[in-house]
């Protein structure tokens, strides 16, 4: 037989549980509401910062660059679209102009090849002629690589470095004096998680992104007094044609959408993250899932473990290719 005191205790416990639930749930929803409001206010501030800003996007014909162009245009930015394919750039310019809702800024198109150092000075001059100045430079264009170090000809290493590192550096240096003169500007480098950690069979690509990270970190420190912001963005895998267009050990096109790239985030999502990072004037942004993010910390805090993991990955990948 249950005693009255026991029943009273059970009833009291249930009442306390109910009270705690009625207290916690509103508190939880309140916190979520405050967080959502905070994110909304940040996005409004980002749009205000970038409205009417002159934004240059390299590699704008496809993938992340194309999506960045859409996001920044929708926010009211004045765009300069850069790339090699003039037809694709002009089509994008018309598409953006046609999608405008009260937007009056017709995007300009400037064609040049980052792999050709001789074209960059003239391209920078043409970019400056579009609106007279540049507020934001997004160094997005790049090329990926697949291959073993032992089989890769050095011309491939040079090509990847030219497009991913020397080209963006040259363009940045060409546009930098006008920013310094105005005491205003924002330079964005689209790097990669592979600019922070190195994985097997990506040597040329990873080396170019490590160089990118180092250069723009130095630039950030040197340009602080000139009021020029520098943001390095390091995404993980993005579902684009980057792997399809990657160069291989002998210089030929890889021509395949590999599994990790196919499972990557959409370019539209990452472009929105790029927009937010620029609007918030962030310095260094890692856009990856939990495991790659942890790999960055493991590389720093437990390098021996990281090296063993990468060696194991290399063995598995080599075995899968030979089977």
UniProtKB/Swiss-Prot annotation:
Q: Name one GO biological process term.
A: ether lipid biosynthetic process
Entry binding sites for NAD(+): 62, 64, 205, 209, 240
InterPro entries for the chain: NAD(P)-bd_dom_sf (IPR036291), Sc_DH/Rdtase_CS (IPR020904), SDR_fam (IPR002347)
Where is this gene product found?
A: Endoplasmic reticulum membrane
UniProt cross-references to Gene3D superfamilies, sorted A to Z: NAD(P)-binding Rossmann-like Domain
GO cellular component assignments = endoplasmic reticulum membrane; membrane; nucleus; peroxisome; transcription regulator complex
Record-listed substrate binding positions: 192
What keywords does the record list, in alphabetical order?
A: Endoplasmic reticulum, Membrane, NAD, NADP, Oxidoreductase, Signal-anchor, Transmembrane, Transmembrane helix
Is DNA-binding one of the keywords?
Answer: no
Q: Give the Cytoplasmic membrane side ranges.
A: 1-17
Q: Which residues cross the membrane?
A: 18-38
Query: What EC designation does it have?
Result: 1.1.-.-
Which segments does the topology annotation call Lumenal?
A: 39-323
User: Keyword Electron transport: yes or no?
Assistant: no
Database matches in Pfam families: adh_short
Please provide, alphabetically and separated by semicolons, the GO molecular function terms listed in this UniProt record. acylglycerone-phosphate reductase (NADP+) activity; DNA-binding transcription factor binding; transcription corepressor activity
Q: How does it sit in the membrane?
A: Single-pass type II membrane protein
The active site annotation covers 205 (proton acceptor)
* Top-level division of the source organism's lineage: Eukaryota
Role played: Putative oxidoreductase.
User: What is stated as this protein's family in its record?
Assistant: Belongs to the short-chain dehydrogenases/reductases (SDR) family.
Q: What is this protein called?
A: Dehydrogenase/reductase SDR family member 7B
Mind giving the lineage of the organism this protein is from? Eukaryota, Metazoa, Chordata, Craniata, Vertebrata
Q: Which gene encodes it?
A: Dhrs7b
């Amino acid at each position: 037989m249950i005693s009255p005191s026991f029943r009273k205790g059970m009833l009291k416990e249930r009442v306390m549980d109910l009270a705690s639930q009625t207290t916690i749930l509103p508190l939880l929803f309140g916190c979520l509401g405050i967080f959502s409001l905070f994110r909304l206010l940040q996005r409004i501030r980002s749009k205000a910062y970038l409205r009417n800003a002159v934004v240059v996007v390299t590699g704008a014909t496809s993938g992340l660059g194309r999506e960045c162009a859409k996001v920044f245009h929708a926010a009211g930015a004045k765009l300069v679209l850069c790339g090699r394919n003039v037809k694709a750039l002009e089509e994008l310019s018309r598409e953006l102009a046609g999608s405008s809702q009260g937007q009056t800024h017709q995007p300009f198109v400037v064609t040049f090849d980052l792999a050709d150092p001789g074209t960059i000075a003239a391209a920078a001059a043409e970019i400056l002629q579009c609106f007279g100045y540049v507020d934001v430079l997004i160094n997005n264009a790049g090329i990926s690589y697949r291959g073993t170090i032992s089989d890769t000809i050095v011309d491939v290493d040079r090509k990847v470095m030219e497009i991913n590192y020397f080209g963006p550096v040259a363009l940045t240096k060409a546009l930098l004096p006008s920013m310094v003169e105005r005491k205003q500007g924002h330079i964005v480098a689209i790097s990669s998680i592979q600019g922070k950690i190195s994985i097997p069979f990506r040597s040329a690509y990873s080396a170019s992104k490590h160089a990118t990270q180092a250069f723009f970190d130095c630039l950030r420190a040197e340009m602080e007094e000139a009021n020029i912001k520098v943001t390095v963005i390091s995404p993980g895998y993005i579902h684009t044609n980057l792997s399809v267009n990657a160069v291989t050990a002998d210089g030929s096109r890889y021509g395949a959408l590999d599994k990790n790239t196919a499972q990557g985030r959409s370019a539209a999502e990452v472009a929105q993250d790029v927009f937010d990072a620029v609007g918030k004037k962030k310095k260094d942004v890692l856009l990856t899932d939990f495991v790659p993010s942890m790999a960055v910390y493991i590389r720093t805090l437990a390098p021996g473990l990281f090296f063993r993991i990468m060696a194991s990955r290399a063995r598995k990948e080599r075995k899968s290719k030979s089977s």
